[in-house]
Amino acid sequence: MKIQQNISLMEKLTILSDAAKYDVACTSSGVDRGGDGIGLGNSISCGICHTFSADGRCVSLLKILFTNECIFNCSYCQNNCNSDVRRAAFTPEEVCELTMEFYRRNYIEGLFLSSGIMVSPNYTMELLYQTLYKLRTAHHFNGYIHVKAIPGADPLLIEKTGFLADRMSINLELPTADSLKKLAPCKSRNTILKPMRMVQNGITENKNEVALYRHAPKFVPAGQSTQMIIGATPENDYQIVSIAENLYQKFDLKRVFYSAFVNVTHNSNLPALPGGPPLLREHRLYQADWLLRYYKFKADELLSPERPDFNIFLDPKCDWAIRHLEYFPVEINRADYDMLLRVPGIGYKSASRIVKARRHSTLDFANLKKIGVVLKRALYFITCSGRMMYRTKLEEDYICRNLMGDKTQIPREIRESGYKQLSLFDTQLSTEGLLLS
């Protein structure tokens, strides 16, 4: 494993932006518009990814690895020390130059910087710190920065870097310690959770400092996140959602990201995926994650040991409602906010608008449509002044059949990929024709 010498900055960018594509910073915006040689701008230039802010804005980030060299041999990673891939590494100044040039051209609004482990965790973390320090001080870059903290690095280095970054993340990698031991024996769960706890404590302490001293430097002001690979190991959806719930409760994470496993190494320890990455499963986990964070659901309400996986035909909220018809129909003009949140087709913004609007007048279905309620899902579960929108049966089979006819239950890009739910661990199947990207 050798880093190629004397390669251009553009070649490094090509190699290290491609190497970063499986590091999940965000949900994809789905934008694939390239430059036409006449107009200005290019939404798919090397390294540019798209994320969404809390208020729904699409934000472009320069997403790169500092280096794809790595001393570890994780079975699932395309950059592991035994992979036959082109190796490259930036210098701190090169990352600064790229970030500033992309920013000046209005290609990006921030930087997402991760890295393989070069030489040692401390050595790599020091390089990331130097990069952020130069960006903030020498280049006066005030844009958004999301940086990966390196497990096993000196806590002081992670702390210093946290005062320069907006968001910091430490990847959980795999859902359980047993899975991590099997596929990444060079890593340990404790090594990952320890810096996660340190960042959590640092954020809490810093909030108290900022409350006392308004101009105190801010430590990871956008919070911390993590990522789990889904489908490489035998954990079910119930285990994964329960782990995410614990992470939110015990580590105050802002976000847990889920990455559908893509078999890029063809390691014998990894499952065969003849149907491609489990994209629908990833989608259902994100929907459930949203319910945990914004809709006050608990993991035990969505799934159970007896029913450990999500319905592939219905989203988790619709599935929960159909299994709990005893709570429905809900009277829109009287139900409290928490109950409104549990109605399919009513989002947290719509629920707030309903509560505010009904203070002034009685609401009907026309009002709900204007408010933003998705009536094609909600109509089975609500009444307005004691009346349902249509004469519908409050029966599980009837509602289920009608909701399953709603094509929005499965996103278009997943439907068109020919996705179907398969056994995740039939390793006897041929691995030819796997989807690699």
Regions found by a protein language model. Name each.
Residues 64-93:
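Canonical Radical SAM [4Fe-4S] cluster-binding loop centered on the CxxxCxxC motif
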Residues 100-114, 288:
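Short Fe-S-cluster ligation motifs
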Residues 61, 74, 113, 170, ...:
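Conserved, mostly hydrophobic/aromatic
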Residues 1-69, 374, 382, 390-437:
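Flexible, acidic/Gly-rich N-terminal and inter-domain linker regions that tether
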Residues 96, 119-302:
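Conserved AdoMet/S-adenosylmethionine-binding subsite of the radical SAM
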